């Protein structure tokens, strides 16, 4: 059974996570960081940085809409996006085509699990019967 967290809190926590991931993606031109973590180095870094910019925008929307009208619709969209992202990470990990080491694999499995949990929490809040 999923935790019973208020929808407002789920959106605010997710906004903080999105902003944190955005900061990491902004550093995608720093190859040594990705190599240290055993993660694939984004080439070109521009795409990862663009994703970081999009995540900043999403974090702002999540923070501002928390506890307000439109919260359920945002939660639904975030649930779908998080589920898709988790699925993509798992597919890539299972394909064995990612240039990662043991540390990188562990990090990506954790991220996939976190995204799946996030998707479930947002889905429960987004499709809850009033």
What positions do the PLM features span?
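Cytosolic juxtamembrane helix and N-cap/initiation of the first transmembrane helix
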Residues: 1-18
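Core segments of alpha-helical transmembrane spans in multipass integral membrane proteins
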Residues: 16-27, 43-67, 79-87, 113
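Membrane-embedded alpha-helical segments in integral membrane proteins
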Residues: 23-36, 88-93
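Membrane-interface helix termini and inter-helical loops of multi-pass transporters
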Residues: 31-42, 96-102
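Juxtamembrane helix-break-helix junctions at the cytosolic face
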Residues: 39, 60-73, 93-97
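Individual transmembrane alpha-helices with interfacial aromatic-anchor signatures
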Residues: 80, 102-116
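Membrane-helix boundary connector in multi-pass membrane proteins
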Residues: 87-107, 124-128
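Membrane-water interface at the C-terminal end of transmembrane alpha helices
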Residues: 113-130
């Amino acid at each position: 059974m999923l935790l019973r967290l208020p929808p407002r809190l789920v959106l605010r926590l997710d906004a903080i996570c999105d902003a944190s991931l955005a900061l990491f993606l902004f550093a995608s031109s720093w190859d040594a960081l990705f190599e240290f973590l055993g993660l694939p180095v984004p080439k070109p870094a521009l795409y990862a940085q663009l994703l970081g910019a999009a995540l900043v925008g999403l974090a702002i929307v999540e923070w501002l809409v928390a506890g307000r009208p439109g919260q359920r619709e945002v939660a639904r969209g975030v649930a779908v996006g998080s589920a898709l992202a988790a699925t993509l990470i798992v597919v890539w990990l299972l394909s064995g085509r990612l240039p990662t080491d043991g540390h990188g694999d562990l990090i990506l499995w954790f991220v996939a699990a976190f995204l799946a949990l996030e998707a479930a929490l947002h889905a429960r809040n987004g499709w809850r019967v009033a």
